[in-house]
Amino acid sequence: ATVKVTLIKSVTGRIPNHKLXVKGL
């Protein structure tokens, strides 16, 4: 799970739009 969170954080950090989508979920 920690690895997934790290990957998600890395992606969200690069793509602000993705971060919003993740927050919505």
UniProtKB/Swiss-Prot annotation:
GO terms for cellular component: ribonucleoprotein complex; ribosome. It comes from the Bacteria. Keywords: Ribonucleoprotein, Ribosomal protein. Belongs to the universal ribosomal protein uL30 family. Part of the 50S ribosomal subunit. This is Large ribosomal subunit protein uL30. It comes from Pseudomonas fluorescens biotype A. The lineage of its organism: Bacteria, Pseudomonadati, Pseudomonadota, Gammaproteobacteria, Pseudomonadales.
